[in-house]
Design a protein with these regions (language model features):
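Short, surface-exposed polybasic-aromatic patches that bind anionic ligands, especially phosphate groups
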Residues: 1-274
Length: 274
């Protein structure tokens, strides 16, 4: 069941991973069976009339087909699943998802990575927020505050490091209060471990960006991040000089360099299990 929860800033959507995948398929025009259970679900909520989505849902789905990976990771919580992580940079937001094995991949997991231009993300958020239900209420939340978009546009690394977990915590508080303990715990974990979600740029599962040369500039270290987020448990996992990097075009990436990717995933999972 897709649930929508009102907040002061808008609506937070909650759906299962299956429903999230079905919505992506439907948005991409791959789900054409009018008798499909997910179409029935949408029909039952008044979002499909006959065999066609109502106009505002059509616009929503069209936007989702372009930006759903980012939007779903941020505002559509696959409750209880550690499958999606995201990070943001001066010019883009990126979502990575392990197709098997949970949020943190090992060498056997397939990792999918999507990126969206932050200006497009901003326009999509505000555009979708303006698309009204018949009652005139917005369809998607406006819970991502202006200050975060400002940080993105200005390439302000310090603001990004503060605002990403702040937004996640705000969402976690809403879900923890309004939804259920399991989902609230999921988002609280996302908030507290948000800097781990600032993951490496993925070419394949075990390939990291080349840290040599002038194409990268350090904007923070792991110690800086731990201090900002007060996640002291993670400080012991990495040396203080592990860099967070921005490339010559201002693209923001984080880099973690343990002895091996396998050690990283094992360490993180151990901390999360405590």
């Amino acid at each position: 069941m897709i649930n929508a929860y009102e907040t002061e800033d808008g609506v937070v959507f909650d759906m299962s991973n299956l429903e999230c995948e079905a919505l992506r398929s439907y948005a991409d025009g791959l789900l054409s069976d009018p008798e499909h259970p997910f179409v029935e679900l949408l029909r039952g909520q008044g979002l499909v009339v006959g065999d066609a989505p109502v106009p505002h849902l059509g616009a929503l789905l069209q936007a989702f087909s372009q930006a759903t990976k980012v939007l779903a990771a941020w505002v559509v919580a696959p409750a209880g699943w550690r499958r999606v992580t995201f990070f943001v940079g001066p010019h883009s937001a990126v979502v990575s998802r392990c197709d098997d094995g949970g949020l943190y991949a090992d060498e056997h997991d397939m990792v999918s990575v999507w990126a969206i231009d932050s200006a497009q993300l901003r326009d999509t958020f505000f555009g979708l927020s303006a698309i009204g239900e018949p009652t005139g209420e917005g369809v998607l939340p406006t819970a991502v505050p202006e200050v975060l978009f400002s940080a993105l546009e200005q390439g302000d690394g310090a603001k990004i490091l503060v605002e990403v977990p702040k937004v996640a915590r705000e969402i976690a508080e809403v879900i923890d209060t309004e939804i259920d303990e399991a989902t609230g715990t999921f988002w609280a974990d996302v908030a507290d471990e948000a800097w781990v979600g600032l993951t490496v740029r993925v070419d394949d599962v075990v390939t990291y960006p080349d840290l040599l040369g002038d194409s990268w500039r350090v904007i923070a270290t792991s110690q800086d991040v731990c201090e900002v987020l007060s996640v002291v448990e993670f400080a012991k996992l990495y040396p203080d000089d592990v860099p967070l990097l921005a490339d010559k075009d201002g693209e923001f990436w984080a880099a973690a360099a343990p002895s091996s990717p396998e050690v990283l995933w094992e360490d993180v999972e151990d901390v999360l299990a405590e």
